[in-house]
């Protein structure tokens, strides 16, 4: 179940192939190499810090697995997760393979 802290409709729809499962938004992204994956993670980290909402993620060479959920809302999906997913989409567009 998705809950919105503000009870407003979602304004940001994720563009990456996000899967909703177990009250999380999940995706796995691939990059050219480790350096590109780490650069992406660094950009996301700065944006997440600004938003005060941080992903659960792991990196293995050129892959980044991301899980988004709101821990302080009982580990459920909220507007915060959808907003961060939208920012991750925006950042990923710079790195996406064509």
Give the label of every model feature segment.
Residues 24-32:
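Short, well-ordered beta-strand elements within core beta-sheets of diverse protein domains
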Residues 50-60, 86-98:
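A short N-terminal helical cap/helix-turn-helix that marks the beginning
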Residues 62-69:
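A generic structural motif
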Residues 70-95:
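C-terminal structural segments of small proteins and small subunits
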Residues 39-47:
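Short amphipathic alpha-helix segments
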Residues 34-39, 76-77:
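Short, conserved charged micro-motifs
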Residues 7, 11-24:
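Short aromatic-glycine-(Arg/Gly/Cys) micro-motifs in beta-strand/loop hairpins
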